[in-house]
Amino acid sequence: MARSYGGRVLAAMTLLGIAAAVLAALGAQLLFQLQAGRAELRGLRAEGLGQELGAGPGLPEDAAGTLLPLAAALAALVLVLGFTCLLLAALCGHLGAELARGPGPRRSDWFLYDCRLLRHVALGLFCCGISVYLAALSIYALLLFEIETGAAAASILGSGTLVLVAVLTHTLLRAARAARRGLHELSPPSFEDDLARPAEVSKASPRAQPQQGIHRRTPYSTCPEPGDPFGSMATATAPAALEGGWESSLPASRMHRTLSAGLGHWDGVTHEMRRMLGHRPGSMGKDSTLV
């Protein structure tokens, strides 16, 4: 089964933390070796062998005295960079693991995806630590070996340091450009598919609401006039017809047209009868003879 985005990030941060711990250990070891070499050099000078050291094939005394503090400072910088990278990796991994234990399996994925800048900083510190360590190691090679051997080792280590710095700069610039593009232009991880489902449901729910409103709407609305027996009869028979199953057999629009046509015919008959009764000749006394 393929790992999730958070699992892959946690595995990468674990490996980065292990490498940063190894780098910090190498920096501390180099720092102690330089300190021991400096104490040994001072002991040789105290014994009266300074002239022999100055005349030997190694570096001159003034150059060695200048390069030793520089190499020690670089080794201390390597130690600081390694510990900083280790702490960042451990912090990011710990927070991601704690969020994964909480409710919602995608919380840690979102956290690790949002803190990608922190991961880039940790990786940059690690690469800078390696470059500084190679520079300090080249100086230590000049101090430890003879001039020819030390120069060859220092040149190789220095060229490797320059190549590593160039690759590091190019990689960090590309990572910064990718971070500026935003979430929509980056390659989306697998957990973004889960967010599309609530959006589709929210788009489909307004479509279902008008359909429910159509079913709830009555197919007709008539208001019978007072004293109109036909209107009251139509109003009384319409619900009975709907209960008898007309709604299932006829559409709402067709039923509405049929009822409107029938009611219109009876309205014409009642209107004609009222007009004839309204224009009766004679007075009230003559009306009694008609009865």
From Swiss-Prot:
Top-level taxon in the UniProt lineage: Eukaryota
Transmembrane found in the keyword field: yes
InterPro entries membership: Jiraiya, TM221
GO cellular component, one term: membrane
Subcellular location: Membrane
Membrane-spanning residues: 12-32, 70-90, 125-145, 153-173
Topology within the bilayer: Multi-pass membrane protein
Pfam family, one: Jiraiya
Chain segments carrying region Disordered: 189-219
Keywords carried by this UniProt record: Membrane, Transmembrane, Transmembrane helix
PANTHER family: TRANSMEMBRANE PROTEIN 221
Name listed for the protein in its UniProt record: Transmembrane protein 221
Organism: Homo sapiens (Human)
